[in-house]
From Swiss-Prot:
Protein name: Small ribosomal subunit protein uS7
Gene behind the chain: rpsG
GO annotation, biological process: translation
Similarity comment text for this entry: Belongs to the universal ribosomal protein uS7 family.
InterPro entries named among the record's database cross-references: Ribosomal_uS7, Ribosomal_uS7_bac/org-type, Ribosomal_uS7_CS, Ribosomal_uS7_dom, Ribosomal_uS7_dom_sf
The keyword Manganese appears for this protein: no
Native source species: Citrobacter koseri (strain ATCC BAA-895 / CDC 4225-83 / SGSC4696)
Leader peptide range in chain numbering: none
Keyword Ribosomal protein: yes
HAMAP family the record matches: Ribosomal_uS7_B
Xref: PROSITE patterns: RIBOSOMAL_S7
Length: 156
């Protein structure tokens, strides 16, 4: 780690079709082996399907799906006197988005549909309807934080 100065976070360029930084980040998370154009094709196709199903614009529908998956609290391990506690902590906004996107992509990859675009569209549709694997993951994380509320005073 550099000691001289704090290095700022890299600015991510907005995606070419919608001009959204959030969507550009989502494409980057979905991308495998540096194949960005393939990832973009998959995302845009999935968003088109999502927009048709929901009746909203692509970006609006994506935002709703993402909002339903964003976690507000998570647990972090904290070692105190020989025992490890799962301490609930609030999630920072940037990490909130990153986790939500990662969970959606993971859930889509585990689905059994034909193409990745269809799997992603189905997962986003489920997320928008507050169901599906990604939403379940968020609820599990929240449940874990709720169960360990007693250790909240170990925060750092």
């Amino acid at each position: 780690m550099p000691r001289r100065r704090v290095i700022g976070q890299r600015k991510i360029l907005p995606d070419p079709k919608f001009g959204s930084e959030l969507l550009a980040k989502f494409v980057n998370i979905l991308m495998v082996d540096g194949k960005k154009s393939t990832a973009e094709t998959i995302v845009y196709s999935a968003l088109e399907t999502l927009a048709q199903r929901s009746g909203k614009s692509e970006l609006e529908a994506f935002e709703v799906a993402l909002e339903n998956v964003r976690p507000t609290v998570e647990v972090k391990s904290r070692r105190v006197g020989g025992s490890t506690y799962q301490v609930p902590v609030e999630v920072r906004p940037v990490r909130r988005n990153a986790l939500a996107m990662r969970w959606i992509v993971e859930a889509a990859r585990k689905r059994g549909d034909k193409s990745m675009a269809l799997r992603l569209a189905n997962e986003l549709t489920d997320a928008a309807d507050n169901k599906g694997t990604a939403v379940k993951k968020r609820e599990d994380v929240h449940r874990m934080a709720e169960a360990n509320k007693a250790f909240a005073h170990y925060r750092w």
